Amino acid sequence: MAKDEKKAALEAALKKIEKNFGKGAVMRMGEKVDTQISTVPSGSLALDAALGVGGYPRGRIVEIYGPESSGKTTVALHAVAEVQKRGGTAAYIDAENAMDPAYAEALGVDIDQLILSQPNTGEEGLQIADTLISSGAIDIVVVDSVAALVPRAEIEGEMGDSHVGLQARLMSQALRKLSGTIAKTKTIAIFINQIREKVGVMFGNPETTPGGRALKFYSTIRLEVRRAEQIKQSTNVIGNRVKIKVVKNKVAPPFKVAEVDIMYGQGISQSGELLDMAADQDIVDKAGAWYSYHGEKIGQGRENAKKYLEEHPDVSEDIQTQVRKAYGIDAESLEEKEDPEKVKEQRAKKAAPGEEKPAEPASPEKTDK
């Protein structure tokens, strides 16, 4: 087969795949992403860059998984806060019954407007999520966590009873039903998940996530969250350095890693990630332990430089503008920044009765990466 014929055959195959399986099912790693994907920022500039489209795509399923106390819930709550800042409505399905309102509020979540459910069974939790998403009035739903969505038969049974594959079947059935509704209503669905170890695995990674394979298949984005090291102030531990790896991404090339500081009681340190990204792009100069900007020293050591940025918002904003430009991340739209009430009115139309198709909420869209 000639070179031109091979190229034509490949293009025909790619078009057929996209027609059969949807946009983003296959792509060249170096090509530009779809600029029409509507997104909401994750609350972390580094994660927005790693995701490749400037945030979480609307109408898609996202899975966040990792070991215990790695920062999974923190990452999800930052997404909730960002949606609420843009006039959106958020729902939180707390299957673990471990929601901390004070911590969520510290991260920027409007607790008074957050819709919270603490279901008794997995079926109840997923049915509540389905009803909320189907209403067209919800912009983001967080399920915390998949492992805690216990099937009714297991709840009502005796300790020690065998329920092989019951939760996997529940998740498979629920996701088949939810995926289409999520896409139509442009809702972001975030499923937090734990990790387990497969017994008898001698080679390869023994870790897996509970709930079967369905969530892995239906997720547009899968994020693996792991602690890298502790952050100390003198001898006191004040936070954790966390790595967020994009292990699956159907809207941009995957396998990128974002490193963030999660500070106890504060969430993701935006000044810390801004400093790291600016230093990587030579926007902020780093010589030894000193950080400087436009020839002026802003701190000796990373923590002092972070503190300087927190105390000088004008400098921080100027650096952030340059970092966004360097990484190709859009700032929020002028409409959202200047007229938030208008955005709220547009979002309210989604919930208006008689609408055949909910209006897509106004949100920043990603330009060329």
UniProtKB/Swiss-Prot annotation:
Biased composition annotated in UniProt, kind: Basic and acidic residues: 339-369
User: Where is it mostly found?
Assistant: cytoplasm
* Region listing for Disordered, in residue ranges: 328-369
One matching Pfam family is RecA_C
Which residues, if any, are the signal sequence? none
Subcellular location per the Swiss-Prot or TrEMBL entry: Cytoplasm
Keyword Coiled coil in the entry? The reply is no
Xref: InterPro entries? AAA+_ATPase (IPR003593), DNA_recomb/repair_RecA (IPR013765), DNA_recomb/repair_RecA_CS (IPR020584), P-loop_NTPase (IPR027417), RecA-like_C (IPR049261), RecA-like_N (IPR049428), RecA_ATP-bd (IPR020588), RecA_C_sf (IPR023400)
Record's GO cellular component terms: cytosol
Entry's SUPFAM superfamilies?
Answer: P-loop containing nucleoside triphosphate hydrolases (SSF52540), RecA protein, C-terminal domain (SSF54752)
GO terms (molecular function) for this protein are: ATP binding; ATP hydrolysis activity; ATP-dependent DNA damage sensor activity; damaged DNA binding; single-stranded DNA binding
- Residues holding ATP: G66, P67, E68, S69, S70, G71, K72, T73
Q: What does this protein do?
A: Can catalyze the hydrolysis of ATP in the presence of single-stranded DNA, the ATP-dependent uptake of single-stranded DNA by duplex DNA, and the ATP-dependent hybridization of homologous single-stranded DNAs. It interacts with LexA causing its activation and leading to its autocatalytic cleavage.
Q: What is this protein called?
A: Protein RecA
Q: Which organism is it from?
A: Lactobacillus delbrueckii subsp. bulgaricus (strain ATCC BAA-365 / Lb-18)
Q: What does UniProt list as this organism's lineage?
A: Bacteria, Bacillati, Bacillota, Bacilli, Lactobacillales
- What is this protein's gene name? recA
